[in-house]
UniProtKB/Swiss-Prot annotation:
The keyword Membrane does not apply. It comes from Clostridium botulinum (strain Eklund 17B / Type B). It is found in: Cytoplasm. This is Exodeoxyribonuclease 7 large subunit. Bidirectionally degrades single-stranded DNA into large acid-insoluble oligonucleotides, which are then degraded further into small acid-soluble oligonucleotides. GO terms for biological process: DNA catabolic process. It is an enzyme of class 3 (hydrolase). GO terms for cellular component: cytoplasm; exodeoxyribonuclease VII complex. It catalyses: Exonucleolytic cleavage in either 5'- to 3'- or 3'- to 5'-direction to yield nucleoside 5'-phosphates. Heterooligomer composed of large and small subunits. NCBIfam families: xseA. PANTHER family: EXODEOXYRIBONUCLEASE 7 LARGE SUBUNIT. Keywords: Cytoplasm, Exonuclease, Hydrolase, Nuclease.
Length: 399
């Protein structure tokens, strides 16, 4: 039997026809857990439906999605009603959903919530343990794949913001079995390395299964115990992992992580200029204060210096000498006036002046002045003082 050769389109169209004509596959209900959920701008919803062993892609078009009365999320256990078919453009098998009903929470989601609650109660998410991101990081350690878009985005943002910042990559698997162990090794490597300011742990978006390594408890504990601040940049803005909660800062995307970690060079230059102006002002102010204190101390020193004290003492002595001379002069003048007054008094009462007027002073032999005749009641020797001399004689009473 000759084997027929088919084109790819022939093959996919044939499989699609077989599936579309299958009674069971044309109208079925499938139970599973939602993962890798995406809401397209067109209004269509894309996700995967999985269980422990298998996964199938699903799509719900806008016309059906607008009728949904539940909010879909990753990890949700649902019952999907619709049909199976082939998307011929890619040859992929998928379910076309007409209805989606919530059944419960998926196994991974339950596991995620349990670990989240456990770590939260243990204080792993507390703000008081969050380390500050340095304002002016010089060297940033990156733990991510060496070939993904994450490292390219971080490098591009870093070059744009500040080309002086160094990026050091620790290449690690970010998806697959035990990938979290390589991420742990990267964090521990940078904690031992000198001069690293920040660590960024990142990868692109994905389903809950693809991001599950970032939900491992062992990784969460290593992030918590890191001496260096860690920025978590896992998935897209709508994706959250345990690593996001325990990290010091959660960035919605790797590019945003670089924006947070890398300071703008223009901001640094502006800050340096402001600090320079402030320092110059403070230095000038300090110099002015020092000069003022120096001048004040100089004046005080002059007042209390030995030479100043000697000069002041001389000045004080001169003042005292002037006061003493003045007091002596006043005293002399007063005494002179007293002497002149006494001299005038003596002069006024000088006996010689009386004698000049023709009077005489009579004294007995004992130099007693004879004032009355009764003092001469017998013969006595007397002395008579005249203006031009003295004469002696005997007193003879008249009988």
């Amino acid at each position: 039997m000759k084997i027929k050769t088919l084109t790819v389109s022939d093959l996919t169209n044939y499989i699609k026809k077989v599936i579309d004509n299958d009674f069971i596959l044309n109208n079925l209900s499938v139970k599973g857990e939602i993962s890798n959920l995406k809401f397209h701008s067109s209004g269509h919803i894309y996700f995967s439906l999985k269980d422990n062993n298998s996964k199938v892609n699903c799509v719900m078009f806008k016309s059906k999605a607008s009728l949904l009365n539940i909010a879909l999320e990753d990890g949700m256990e649902v019952m999907v009603k619709g049909r199976a078919s082939i998307y011929t453009a890619t040859g992929s098998f998928q379910l076309y959903c007409d209805e989606i009903k919530k059944e419960g929470q998926g196994e991974l989601f339950i596991k995620f919530e349990a670990l989240k609650e456990k770590l939260s109660k243990s204080g792993y998410f507390d703000e008081k343990y969050k380390k500050n991101i340095p304002m002016y990081a010089k060297r940033i350690g990156i733990v991510t794949s060496s070939t993904g878009a994450v490292i390219r985005d971080i490098i591009n943002v870093t070059k744009r913001r500040n080309s002086l910042v160094d990026i050091i990559l620790y290449p690690a698997k970010v998806q697959g079995d035990n990938a979290y162990k390589e991420i742990i090794a990267g964090i521990e490597y940078f904690n031992k390395k000198k001069n690293i300011d920040i660590i960024i742990v990142g990868r692109g978006g994905g389903s809950i299964e693809e991001l599950w390594n970032f939900n491992e408890e062992e990784l969460a504990k290593v992030i918590f115990n890191s001496k260096l601040p860690i920025i978590s940049a896992v998935g897209h803005e709508v994706d959250f992992t345990i690593s996001d909660f325990v990290s010091d800062v959660r960035a919605a995307t790797p590019s945003q992580a670089a924006e947070i970690a890398v300071p703008l060079l223009s901001d640094i230059n502006t800050r340096i200029y402001e600090i320079s102006k402030s320092l110059d002002y403070e230095i000038q102010k300090k110099l002015k204060d020092c000069k003022s204190r120096l001048e004040s101390n100089e004046r005080i020193l002059k007042l209390h210096s030995p030479i100043s004290k000697i000069v002041n003492s001389y000045l004080e002595i001169d003042k005292l000498k002037d006061r003493l001379y003045f007091a002596i002069d006043i005293k002399i003048k007063r005494e002179k006036q007293k002497i002149e007054s006494l001299n005038n008094l003596l002069s006024a009462n000088n006996p010689i002046k009386v004698l000049n007027k023709g009077y005489a002073i009579i004294e007995d032999e004992n130099n007693n002045i004879i004032k009355e005749i009764s003092q001469l009641n017998e013969e006595k020797e007397i002395s008579v003082s005249l203006s031009d001399g003295n004469i002696k004689g005997n007193f003879i009473p008249i009988k």
